[in-house]
């Protein structure tokens, strides 16, 4: 999903020096500092990127003679450039303005330091253009681990989230989870309308931050584990050792999935806490509980064989 120049101007409070064509889309999240291009090197040039002139490029132009500066800028603007942004509030060279006007291109200016501006705009564009989807579920932060709780309606996802909030964990979103894939990570957040709200059957919608404080909610969280609730089946084939890993694909990213059978009497919130703690343990340890049991069994068998 692209971003228009007008949207960029509004979100970054950019000063408009030269107005270009309306509704020009920005379709890539990378930016380019055209130092090499101003020196005359255009191999591998990406004109579709936002072009950013900072102190270094500005000083390079400043040291040129007016005729050379005009020549280099006319060449630069002969490409199909979406917009040019000058940082640090630097003065605009007259040759640059004239060349931009010929092509009806956007020239914008920011007071921010170049490196900080590039970092912010790259993150902004990556977020805006990231592939996204919406899933039904509840996203919570448990011990710093983003856990997406899924399952059919009425199975107890929201009630479990409420219990987790009472135990000091944090809610990201209930019912609808907006997910974006950014650099291989899945970032989940709440739709703006339902942010901070939790629907509990029999009670209705509650404002989590009002009842439990602002520390009980989060704007977004990276999804690490999927906890899928399903009704208990006596003949169900459930993983009892934790050796059969299951994954679910979301936007091309595989996420570990745990199936949790639900029946009266099970403390699901405690199980989810244990799953989060176990995830952290597995990330930090080279040995699993199953490996420990196998080692103990071998040691026990060796002792018995010596008797």
Swiss-Prot record:
Task performed by this protein: Catalyzes the ATP- as well as the pyrophosphate-dependent phosphorylation of a specific serine residue in HPr, a phosphocarrier protein of the phosphoenolpyruvate-dependent sugar phosphotransferase system (PTS). HprK/P also catalyzes the pyrophosphate-producing, inorganic phosphate-dependent dephosphorylation (phosphorolysis) of seryl-phosphorylated HPr (P-Ser-HPr).
Oligomer and partners: Homohexamer.
InterPro entries reported for this sequence: HPr(Ser)_kin/Pase, Hpr_kin/Pase_C, Hpr_kin/Pase_Hpr_N, P-loop_NTPase, Ser_kin/Pase_Hpr-like_N_sf
Known EC number: 2.7.11.-, 2.7.4.-
SUPFAM superfamilies: HprK N-terminal domain-like, PEP carboxykinase-like
Upper classification of the organism: Bacteria, Bacillati, Bacillota, Clostridia, Eubacteriales
Protein name: HPr kinase/phosphorylase
Keywords in alphabetical order: ATP-binding, Carbohydrate metabolism, Kinase, Magnesium, Metal-binding, Multifunctional enzyme, Nucleotide-binding, Serine/threonine-protein kinase, Transferase
GO terms (BP aspect): regulation of carbohydrate metabolic process
GO molecular function, one term: magnesium ion binding
Active-site residue numbers: 136, 157, 175 (proton acceptor), 240
Residues reported to bind ATP: 151-158
Residues that bind Mg(2+): 158, 199
Important for the catalytic mechanism of dephosphorylation as annotated region, ranges: 261-266
Native source organism of the sequence: Clostridium perfringens (strain 13 / Type A)
Domain notes: The Walker A ATP-binding motif also binds Pi and PPi.
Leader peptide range in chain numbering: none
Family recorded in the similarity comment: Belongs to the HPrK/P family.
Coiled coil: none
Additional comment: Both phosphorylation and phosphorolysis are carried out by the same active site and suggest a common mechanism for both reactions.
């Amino acid at each position: 999903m692209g971003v228009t120049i007008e949207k960029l101007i509004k979100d970054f409070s950019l000063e408009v020096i030269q107005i270009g064509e309306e509704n020009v889309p920005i379709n890539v999240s990378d930016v380019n500092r055209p130092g090499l291009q101003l020196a005359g090197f255009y191999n591998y040039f990406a004109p579709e990127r936002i072009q950013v002139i900072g102190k270094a490029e500005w000083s390079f132009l400043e040291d040129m003679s007016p005729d050379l500066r005009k020549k280099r800028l006319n060449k630069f603007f002969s490409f199909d450039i979406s917009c040019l942004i000058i940082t640090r509030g630097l003065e605009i060279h007259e040759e640059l303005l004239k060349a931009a006007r010929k092509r009806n291109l956007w020239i914008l200016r920011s007071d921010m330091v170049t490196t900080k501006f590039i970092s912010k705009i790259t993150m902004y564009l990556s977020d805006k253009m990231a592939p996204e989807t919406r899933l039904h579920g509840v996203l919570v932060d448990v011990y710093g681990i983003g856990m997406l709780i899924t399952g059919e309606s009425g199975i107890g996802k929201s009630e479990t989230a409420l219990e987790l909030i009472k135990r000091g964990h944090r809610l990201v979103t209930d019912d609808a989870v907006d997910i974006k894939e950014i650099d291989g990570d899945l970032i989940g957040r709440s739709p703006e309308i339902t942010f901070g709200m939790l629907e509990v059957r029999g009670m209705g919608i509650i404002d989590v931050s009002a009842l439990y404080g602002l520390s009980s909610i989060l704007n977004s969280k990276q999804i690490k584990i999927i906890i899928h609730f399903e009704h208990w089946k006596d003949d169900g084939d459930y993983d009892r050792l934790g050796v059969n890993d299951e994954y679910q694909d979301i936007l091309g990213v595989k996420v570990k999935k745990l199936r949790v059978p639900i029946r009266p009497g099970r403390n699901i919130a405690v199980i989810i806490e244990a799953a989060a703690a176990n995830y952290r343990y597995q990330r930090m340890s080279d040995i699993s509980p199953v490996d420990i049991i196998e080692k103990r069994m071998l040691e026990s068998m060796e002792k018995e064989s010596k008797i």
